[in-house]
């Protein structure tokens, strides 16, 4: 009996928009851009498979290549058999950055007011205050050192003729791999 793959709950993870710089030898591929009825695999198809296997993106159906779930952009595309050594994509992926913790706000009676208007007891609110203190004493998240090593993770899952060369943790606001590209 095959093992059933458990799905990750995307709500438990933060995400971030990053840029990835790729290099690939196109000899074995039907170009960069995914084609639903193509005879050969494409670079985007291999990227999709690696990103979903690593649980870096959370599509509704992993078997259907649909980039809508992750703010995907690409700087260009290549034809069948063409190689590239500086292709850039922009994509929203899972991050190691901790989700913001809920801070406890007390009313004048010392009880936390919940969204539905219910109240917790004072003891629970005091526990919340302790939790709030812990939140402020945590060390700040380092965008590179504390983050998922995206190139290493993806390169382990991608075929040998497709490599992630680098990643940018903080692309400029409004970055689009397509429209921010200066040359092709």
Please tell me what each predicted stretch does.
Residues 1-184:
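Structured-RNA-binding interfaces characteristic of tRNA pseudouridine synthases
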């Amino acid at each position: 009996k095959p093992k059933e793959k458990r799905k990750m709950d995307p709500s438990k993870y933060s995400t971030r928009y990053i840029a990835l710089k790729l290099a690939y030898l196109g000899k074995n591929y039907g170009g960069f851009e995914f084609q639903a009825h193509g005879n050969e695999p494409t670079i985007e198809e291999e990227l999709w498979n690696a990103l979903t296997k690593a649980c870096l993106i959370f599509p509704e159906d992993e078997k259907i290549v649909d980039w809508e779930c992750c703010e995907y952009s690409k700087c260009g595309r290549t034809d069948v058999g063409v190689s590239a050594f500086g292709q850039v994509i922009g994509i929203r992926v899972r991050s190691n950055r901790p989700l913001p913790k809920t801070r406890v706000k007390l009313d004048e009676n010392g009880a936390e007011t919940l969204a539905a208007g219910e109240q917790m007891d004072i003891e629970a609110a005091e526990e919340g205050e302790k939790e709030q203190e812990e939140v402020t004493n945590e060390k700040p998240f380092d965008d590179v050192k504390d983050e998922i090593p995206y190139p290493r993770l993806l390169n382990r899952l991608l075929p040998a003729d497709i490599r992630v060369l680098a990643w940018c943790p903080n692309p400029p606001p409004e970055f689009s791999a397509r429209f921010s590209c200066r040359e092709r």
